[in-house]
Every structure is written in structure tokens, then in C-alpha cells.
């Protein structure tokens, strides 16, 4: 082993030990974070999709951020929200359609890396087809969803 190689062979473990011994704690009043192990996922028993609230409470007024994993074959039916909602597709392909007629074949693929906005009161539907899709959702709560009932369906009731 060369002299330089010997130096680095001894220096690297020492540097690693020093870095773990000098771990810096972040002030939670300045920087908030959740490590992957700290993110609590829950399963929606109705749809089977998984959600994890990252920030805020989407059922209350104020900002929120939620992770949502759509499972293959799950699609919402036409609905709308009272507030704008913002999305970033993190993995998989999320399929999005608009209008009051549910037609999964008329959806458009949104691959990972795509940013999407659902404008307030815009009727849409979305979900996953053959692979899971994980998206980050954020907006101003309360985040409610109202099923869309087409005018012709309301007249029949």
C-alpha cells in the first residue's frame, strides 16, 4: 500500500467516527422534517388507497400536505373540490380525466415528475391503472370532495 493509500485507509474511519460523534441537532422551531420511518401511512378501507399526512390537517382550515398512493385499478368517480389543489407525481403514472362522465379510457397519463393543478369546482376523476402511483397533494383546507351528479341524473330522482 502506498503512503497516500495508508493515510486515507486510516483517515476515512476516523472521519466517519468524528462525523457521527458531532451530529448536529436541528431546532424544530426552525426546521421541521419527517424521516421516512416517521411517516405514518394509513389505508383507506373504502378505496384501499394509502395516505400519509405530512403537514397540517386536511380536514381543517389552513395549509396541508399529504402523500397519496393510488393502488392499481382504483379510480375516483367524477367529483370536485371547493379549493384549488396541487399535486406532484412522485412515482408511477397517475391518470387524470375531467368532466362529469366517468370514462377511464379518456384519462391522460401523468408520469412521475408531473405537476398537476385541480382548480376549485372543476369536475374531474383520477386514479391508477396498472401500477401504483404516489402523489404529493397540497393546498388549503378543509380538503373536501363533492361527488358530481349530472343534471340528467338529478332529474330522474
Regions found by a protein language model. Name each.
Residues 1-11:
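Bacterial N-terminal signal peptides that target proteins for export
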Residues 9-19:
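Bacterial N-terminal signal peptides
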Residues 22-64, 150-157:
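A short, N-terminal "cap"/entry segment at the start of jelly-roll beta-barrel domains
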Residues 30-32, 105, 125-157:
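Double-stranded beta-helix
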Amino acid at each position: 500500500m502506498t503512503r497516500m493509500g495508508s493515510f486515507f485507509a486510516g483517515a476515512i474511519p476516523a472521519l466517519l467516527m468524528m462525523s457521527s460523534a458531532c451530529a448536529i441537532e436541528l431546532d424544530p422551531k426552525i426546521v421541521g422534517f419527517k424521516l421516512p420511518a416517521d411517516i405514518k401511512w394509513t389505508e383507506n378501507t373504502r378505496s384501499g388507497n394509502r395516505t400519509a399526512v405530512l403537514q397540517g390537517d386536511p380536514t381543517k382550515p389552513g395549509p396541508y400536505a399529504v402523500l397519496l398512493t393510488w393502488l392499481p385499478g382504483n379510480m375516483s368517480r367524477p367529483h370536485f373540490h371547493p379549493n384549488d389543489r396541487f399535486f406532484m407525481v412522485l412515482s408511477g403514472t397517475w391518470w387524470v380525466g375531467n368532466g362529469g362522465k366517468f370514462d377511464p379510457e379518456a384519462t391522460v397519463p401523468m408520469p412521475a415528475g408531473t405537476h398537476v393543478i385541480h382548480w376549485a369546482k372543476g369536475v374531474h376523476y383520477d386514479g391508477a391503472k396498472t401500477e401504483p402511483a404516489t402523489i404529493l397533494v397540497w393546498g388549503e383546507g378543509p380538503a373536501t370532495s363533492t361527488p358530481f351528479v349530472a343534471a340528467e341524473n338529478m332529474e330522474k330522482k
